Amino acid sequence: MPEGRRAVYLNPGLIFGTGSHGTTRLCLEGVERYVRPGDRVLDLGTGSGILAIAALLLGAEQAVGCDIDPKAARVAAENASYNGVEGRFQVYTGDVNGDAELQQKLAGRYQVVLANIIADIIIPLTAAAGNYLAPGGTFLTSGIIDSRARDVAEALERNGFTIVETREREGWVSYAAQKK
């Protein structure tokens, strides 16, 4: 393993997020770039929890994940335990755009907000992501097929974000964006 890197141990079950898909790799590289020791991280659509767990292993103080799939929340919690970060990782089930109780649980500001989901979900999620972002924080998003990249970029801009980095791999796009 390259120096300075750490392994993330996973049992994804039937949940997305093993680290082998191009979108997950793009987001993991973004986590390496933008997460700093002591950060609070919010992972919207946490899946297996790989992104939040990686952030914790890189020094984030706390990570919170949420997913609409109860199985994903269970798998993410198990994976946090495999990696020894379960005490710093909370996982919730629900839709951040329509669940007031979940919105209260997620309340607070995060230095990094993650979303590795498809464009049709990211687009309406950009407003919520901005509400959780701390000043100077970064919204890292991937799962965007290149033919939908412009749509996501426009949604980010409409919701007060400036795209600070665009990365592409295998027909997928990832954005790092910050609030204006």
Could you say what each language-model-derived stretch is?
Residues L14, T18-V96:
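Conserved SAM/SAH cofactor-binding pocket of Class I
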Residues M1-E3, G45-A52, G98-D99, I122-T126:
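Short hydrophobic/aromatic-rich motifs at helix boundaries and adjacent loops
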Residues M1-G17:
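Non-catalytic substrate-recognition/targeting regions of SAM-dependent transferases
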Residues M1-R5, P37, Q103-L106:
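Short, glycine- and charge-enriched coil/turn segments that flank and shape catalytic ligand pockets
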